[in-house]
Amino acid sequence: MQVPLLDLKAQYATIKNEILAAVTEVLESQRCIGGPKVAELEEKIAAISDCKFAVGVSSGTDAILNSLMSLDIGVGDEVITTSFTFFATVGCIARAGAKPVFVDIDSKTFNINPELIETAVTKKTKAIMPVHLFGQMADMDPIMKVANKYNLAVIEDAAQSITSTYKGRKAGSIGTVGCFSFFPSKNLGGIGDGGMIVTNDEHLYERLLVMRNHGQVSSYSYKYVGANFRLDPIQAVALLVKLPHLDKWTEARRHNAAYYDKKFTGTVVQTPYISADCASIYNQYVIRVPKRDEVVAHLQENNIGCNVYYPVPLHLQECFRHLGYKEDDLAESEKAAKEVMALPIYPELTDKMQDYTVKTILEFFQ
């Protein structure tokens, strides 16, 4: 049996005709930049995120970068964040000219440990960037308490967590801005790159709109130095086709996660810990196991897809060496990087595929 880590073709087969019709409509109109479909998607993403405003952008990475630039965060500023995340979180801070300041993660959720944030605040701190990793939101109340105390912006990196909740509140709706990714592997994935910024701040919303189009405020008149962060209408129409299915697909992921949880009960496999305050959307199903690299190799030998998110925390990456971090500085992040691995969790996964995956893992430890 073969079990891919992700099977986008299986999802596409269920909506193929709708996708083709929607994309064809854009091509025939030749309205290939901006337009009503982008605006419609923005309105709908704002609604499902319980936010007033949304700005479509070219990727989740650009959602973060535009947010930083629109908040005037740059050279001389510091942004507190996590090292155990995808590169874009921290890469954007550096690209904006600011300095990333790392704090360690909670060992159970893998999200930033809010108890460590306040001690990292300095006179140069301008923002906190929590990451809602793998589909579960960070512990936002204590993060917002620190942010409010020191007048800091909060940029929610919600790339992996669209519609996930914390105490009933949606990802992206609690901080200053929320940043989503529509990379094809996401719960709501496009047919290429795409992203979205949500906010309840009207002034910031207007700035984000201007910044995504080079900083232009009227024809060939530029108030700011922005960039081309625009979302293509082809991506917008594909996402509009998928959006009505999102809740169903997310519930299927939750069903698959519960199935794994039950099968791994009482074994050496440590299943995902989901806080009682959170409802995860399970963009990834990440387990912890001893001898992780050997388990990964064993699964691959048995035609089961898996991956490691993330094998090297960002504070130990060569490009951030100048920041002065060394091994053992962020013990929980480094420990997680050596023990975690992601299993297939997509909605079309069958019980038989999950049974084979569980059986193969447990056989390794016999």
Give, region by region, the residue ranges found by the protein language model.
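Short beta-strand-to-turn element immediately C-terminal to the catalytic PLP-Schiff-base lysine
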Residues: 180-181, 195-200, 240
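Phosphate-binding glycine-rich loop
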Residues: 29-78, 92-96, 102-104, 169
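PLP-dependent aminotransferase class I/II
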Residues: 9, 36-44, 48-52, 115, ...
